């Protein structure tokens, strides 16, 4: 079962995919979107769904530290509802608190990546962490 993890932002969607057995997550790419212009990257997402033969989506939920839900959680859930409708695949949600912070720390401390380069990969790595956390919880 291949699971696709998504880190949904207002300008980008980080994409990760599980291995066929559902044990490990790998970052795939970052899809540029524009919420204000109603451009959500569904065409590119569809190409990736076909390429990787995806069976399920996991969308990160950026809850507040006190476990409350803000406007970004609503946007992520709306994105999840839309991909469920478009691709007719199940969608689960994973708490993503601190995954971007964790991703940034990994890039700085372990890989010594410059700020400009971090901006280009941070969402993909965050999607990978969201998906890996989900896989670890499920299996």
Curated annotation (Swiss-Prot):
Listed GO MF terms: nuclease activity
Localization terms from the record: Cytoplasm
Sequence similarity: Belongs to the YqgF nuclease family.
GO CC annotation terms, alphabetical: cytosol
Chief localisation class: cytoplasm
Protein name as annotated: Putative pre-16S rRNA nuclease
Alphabetical list of CDD domains matching this protein: YqgF (cd16964)
Entry function: Could be a nuclease involved in processing of the 5'-end of pre-16S rRNA.
Entry EC number(s): 3.1.-.-
GO biological process: rRNA 5'-end processing
Top-level taxonomic group: Bacteria
Top EC category: hydrolase
Organism: Streptococcus thermophilus (strain ATCC BAA-491 / LMD-9)
Alphabetical UniProt keywords: Cytoplasm, Hydrolase, Nuclease, Ribosome biogenesis
């Amino acid at each position: 079962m291949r699971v696709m993890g998504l880190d949904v932002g207002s300008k980008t969607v980080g994409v990760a995919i599980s291995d066929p057995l559902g044990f490990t997550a790998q970052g795939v790419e970052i899809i540029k979107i524009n919420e204000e212009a109603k451009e959500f990257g569904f065409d590119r997402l569809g190409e990736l769904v076909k390429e990787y033969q995806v069976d399920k989506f996991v969308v990160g939920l950026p809850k507040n530290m006190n476990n409350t839900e803000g406007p970004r959680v609503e946007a992520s859930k709306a994105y999840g509802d839309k991909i469920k409708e478009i691709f007719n695949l199940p969608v689960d949600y994973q708490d993503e608190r601190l995954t971007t912070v964790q991703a940034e720390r990994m890039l700085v401390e372990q890989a010594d990546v410059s700020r400009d380069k971090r901006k280009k990969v941070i969402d993909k790595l965050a999607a990978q962490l969201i998906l890996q956390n989900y896989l670890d919880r499920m299996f």
